[in-house]
Amino acid sequence: IAVYPEHAKRVSVFHNLINWNRIRSKAEQKGGFTDGYTGMRLLTVGRLIREKALELSVQAMKLLKDEGIQARWYVLGEGEARASLRRLIRKLGLEQDFLLLGSTDNPYPYYKQADIYVHASRHEGKSIAIQEAMYLGCPVVLSHCSGNREQNTNGVEGVMCDLSAKSIAEHVKMLIQDESLRKNCSHAAAARIQASEENVEMLLKICDQE
């Protein structure tokens, strides 16, 4: 647009057009957590790679456990960091507290059943996982990076944390202990993403005009 301002009216931007009806339907299917845990469930979805900084989430879970916070953290995804993460989990004695569940064809029941979604990564674009979590009503804890900041207003749909185990733990603890904040963020997160469903209608209108 800066180079060809005369074409500005012909340009529209659409981020991650997603079939929300499909996600809504799949979230209602059988699946999700099977361990019978009744405490607070934390969820992260993504590849097990350095960029996702999951070692900090493991360390954050240790801090939460040491403070007596009742929670269990689940991660959906696979990647090259699995072995190192498992070693760290064993070293910190978190085998029953931080669970690597692997990949699944249908993550949506997990989103729906989770209490808090955590996405504390080193770098992020426009994360589909964050959008899906928010759509299904998860309050979010996100690290301060450009892609995450675009998807969350701090204190509205969730909370923003620094990229450190201490900060992640503090912000997760904040949502766990403040039920009112957690519920308000849940409603706001779903409302924000549901409003974006209009993008599909806009795209169809543009296609009809061509």
Q: Predicted segment positions?
A:
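Carbohydrate-associated surface elements
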Residues: 17
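Nucleotide-activated donor-binding/catalytic signature segment of Leloir-type glycosyltransferases, i.e.
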Residues: 86-102
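Conserved acidic donor-binding segment of nucleotide-sugar-dependent glycosyltransferases
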Residues: 154-165, 174-179
